[in-house]
Structures are given as structure tokens and as C-alpha cells.
Regions:
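Extracellular lectin-like interaction modules
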Residues: 1-203
Length: 203
């Protein structure tokens, strides 16, 4: 008996854009909101979801292409109280500089500044999303905002795509992190990107 209200950014199957509707789900049940258009401009970034009990939300795009590859990307998003106003994003290994970062505002009059080899500032309204390629001379992007924003990175290796929600800088994680390389990856290159302050580099 979880009540969930959805305001889709664009038209979805069975519901029009910007018109709230409510669904009821029991434990273990799921609901899929699917955009009526395959064009990225009309997908669902910036949609609003509220619930009276805890829920999990996964966002996906089932077919992104960089010739000759095609992949599904997605991640489980976090609630607004877990996002932040400061991010660092490191460029991956996609071919032809196809790495991108997407910023979504949660409040009106959100001022966002991107720092790479140069800086760029812009305003976003609530639910508005803007995407950026990395500047050709920079492998990192430092992002600040005056109000909480979501940051989603599209990256990968060669033409193999992946995507994930980027945690804000205040989400410092832990001092020790373990991970296991998959069996299928043993014949492929494995890359681990780590960022820190300049003062820590010589330690």
C-alpha cells in the first residue's frame, strides 16, 4: 500500500507530460514509466516522483549507440536529500571524445558553473536537464551549483557505453574500498580513476 505520485517531464505511455498521476504498489511490485518517443529530448529526465513510503527508482536507456556498439545504461537514483552542490567528474575512455555529463536541477533559478580548461556558467529551472561534452584539453570537470543538482555521467571504453549517477564531493565514501575484477574482464583493460587534492599527490 505505497502511494506514489509521478509528474512525467514528457509524455509516457498512458499519461501526458506535466500532469500528475498516482499509483499504488504493494511490497515487491514495480511500475515502469516509458517515454512515448525514442528521441533523447523527449525522455524522462527531470520527472518528479514522490511516495509516502520508501521506494527504489531505476533509470535506464535501453539503446545508446556509438558505432559499432550499442548498450543499455542505467542506475538507481537517490533522493534529493542525498545529492549536492559540488561534483568532480573524470573523463573515461570512450572513443572520439564521446564522454558526457548531464546536470538536472531540482529548484528554479539554479546557477551551475562548470570548470574544465575554461569555465562556463548557466541557469537551470526545476526539472531542466543540460548535457555537456568534456572540453578537448581537459580530462576532468569540476561542477558547482547554488542549489542541489543531479549529476549523471555517460562514459565507457572505446564504443562500450556505461552510465551512472555521480555522488557529490561531500559523499566521501570510506578510506578503504575493495572491488573484484570480473572473469570476462581479465582479457580487457581495467581502469581505476582516483581523484584527490593536489596536496595529497606526494603522500
Amino acid at each position: 500500500s505505497t502511494s506514489i505520485t509521478i509528474i512525467p517531464k514528457n509524455d509516457i505511455i498512458g499519461h501526458k507530460a506535466q500532469i500528475p498521476f498516482t499509483i499504488m504498489l504493494n511490497k515487491g511490485q514495480s511500475y515502469s514509466a516509458v517515454a512515448t518517443s525514442q528521441l533523447g529530448l523527449y525522455h524522462l529526465a527531470g520527472s518528479q516522483v514522490t511516495a509516502d513510503k520508501p521506494i527504489a527508482i531505476t533509470v535506464t536507456d535501453d539503446l545508446l549507440e556509438i558505432d559499432p556498439c550499442a548498450d543499455l545504461i542505467g542506475d538507481q537514483i537517490v533522493p534529493i536529500d542525498k545529492i549536492g552542490v559540488e561534483y568532480i567528474v573524470i573523463k573515461g575512455q570512450l572513443s572520439d571524445n564521446n564522454d558526457q555529463v548531464y546536470i538536472t536541477a531540482t529548484e528554479n533559478n539554479t546557477l551551475v558553473t562548470l570548470y574544465g580548461s575554461t569555465s562556463n556558467s548557466f541557469n537551470l529551472s526545476k526539472g531542466e536537464t543540460k548535457g555537456f561534452y568534456y572540453q578537448s584539453t581537459s580530462n576532468t570537470m569540476y561542477i558547482t551549483a547554488n542549489k542541489p543538482i543531479y549529476c549523471f555521467q555517460l562514459t565507457g571504453m572505446g564504443c562500450e557505453l556505461g552510465g551512472a549517477i555521480v555522488p557529490p564531493i561531500v559523499c566521501t565514501g570510506s578510506n578503504k574500498v575493495a572491488y573484484r575484477r570480473g572473469i570476462a574482464a581479465k582479457t580487457n583493460q581495467l581502469i581505476l580513476n582516483v581523484f584527490t587534492t593536489t596536496s595529497n599527490i606526494s603522500l
